[in-house]
């Protein structure tokens, strides 16, 4: 999910510099609602690779993949741009009809992906993911990256909101891998700090394990736990928050993309290349072997809340 969010500014750049361009976006089906929130995306092409790879020998899977391939090849594109630089993204982009473009061998996250491209560009691998995507698009479409990243997301309508009318802070304690998790007692300390500041808490989750973790944390502190929400409806709740504190997960990046003051907590890798990025206050804290203390996160949360109050008075 984070990769999808990080690509949004590149799409905004393309639309700005090539206003006559029609932009279609191929994406994992679970995240298809995210590109649909960008006003410059005309069509979203969903693929279910996570599901297909477990059932490649089944006839239905092959039939479904064949339909997607036929759909892609029915549309002649001037440029098929792979902004991920992975083998799987290169493979699927090669199914579309058009000039295939991407990173060169030295720049791609998976160098072998560059073999599939007909046109390549060099982009420094030490840059943030958002900047890399913007620079790759600029290199292949002949313009220069200018200004701050513009995520340009349309705010979706919510299907659920916390019952209290008070402003709320979204806490996101779940992650895709155990190594990313932050100690529970530190989450409880942050939650109590939020409550002490007169704000509501919404514990956001996306899987059964994450829901269980939220229930456990809320029992030790306070807060509302929403029912299961689609990515679109979760984004609607996150986008309306006063601030957000979350792990290195897609929901945290969504918060920052919507301009919510956001503190990102990193526990298993350095945040430099994938740190929290957005137009409002953002902070990325921690790193591999450097799990931050709750006091540090609470200080940053106070900075985030202060920035939110300043923005509300503009």
Residue ranges and their predicted role:
Residues 1-314:
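Catalytic machinery of carbohydrate-active enzymes
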């Amino acid at each position: 999910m984070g990769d999808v969010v990080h690509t949004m500014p590149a799409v905004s750049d393309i639309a700005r510099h090539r206003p006559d361009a029609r932009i279609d976006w191929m994406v994992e089906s679970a995240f298809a609602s995210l590109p649909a929130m960008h006003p410059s995306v005309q069509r979203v092409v969903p693929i279910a690779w996570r599901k297909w790879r477990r059932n490649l020998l089944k006839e239905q899977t092959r039939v479904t993949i064949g339909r997607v391939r036929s759909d892609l090849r029915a549309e002649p594109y001037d440029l098929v741009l792979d902004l991920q630089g992975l083998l799987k993204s290169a493979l699927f982009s090669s199914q579309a009809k058009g000039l295939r473009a991407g990173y060169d061998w030295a720049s791609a996250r998976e160098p072998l992906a560059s073999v599939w491209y007909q046109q390549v560009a060099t982009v420094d691998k030490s840059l943030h993911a958002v900047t890399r995507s913007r620079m790759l698009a600029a290199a292949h479409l002949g313009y220069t990256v200018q200004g701050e990243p513009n995520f340009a997301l349309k705010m979706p309508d919510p299907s659920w909101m916390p019952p209290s009318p008070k402003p709320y802070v979204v806490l996101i304690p779940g992650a895709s891998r155990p190594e990313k998790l932050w100690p529970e007692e530190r989450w409880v300390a942050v939650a109590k700090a939020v409550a002490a500041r007169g704000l509501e808490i919404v514990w956001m989750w996306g899987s059964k394990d994450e829901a269980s973790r939220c229930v456990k944390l809320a029992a030790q502190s306070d807060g509302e736990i929403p029912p299961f929400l689609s990515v679109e409806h979760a984004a609607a709740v996150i986008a309306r928050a006063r601030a957000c504190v979350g792990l290195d997960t897609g929901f945290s990046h969504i918060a920052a993309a919507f301009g919510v003051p956001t503190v990102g907590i990193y526990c298993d890798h350095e945040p430099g290349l994938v740190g929290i990025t957005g137009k409002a206050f953002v902070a990325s804290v921690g790193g591999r072997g450097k799990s931050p203390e709750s006091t540090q996160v609470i200080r940053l949360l106070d900075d985030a809340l202060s920035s939110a109050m300043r923005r509300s008075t503009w």
